[in-house]
Curated annotation (Swiss-Prot):
A motif (C(P)XCG motif 4) lies at residues 49-53. This is Zinc finger protein MJ0458.1. It comes from Methanocaldococcus jannaschii (strain ATCC 43067 / DSM 2661 / JAL-1 / JCM 10045 / NBRC 100440). Keywords: Metal-binding, Zinc. It comes from the Archaea.
Amino acid sequence: MGEMKYVCISCNAEIAPREKSTKFPCPNCGEVEIVRCERCRKLNNPYKCPKCGFEGP
């Protein structure tokens, strides 16, 4: 099986295996895993949950 690839929800960049990214459930609905790259985390780039529309920094 291949390694799971993650994409940043803010910038759509593929996340490198050793990058300091983060993954967490949507704070509002909890049904979608939000994945953010290190750059977007540091710059507080916004993201939007595709399921419920919640927007976060």
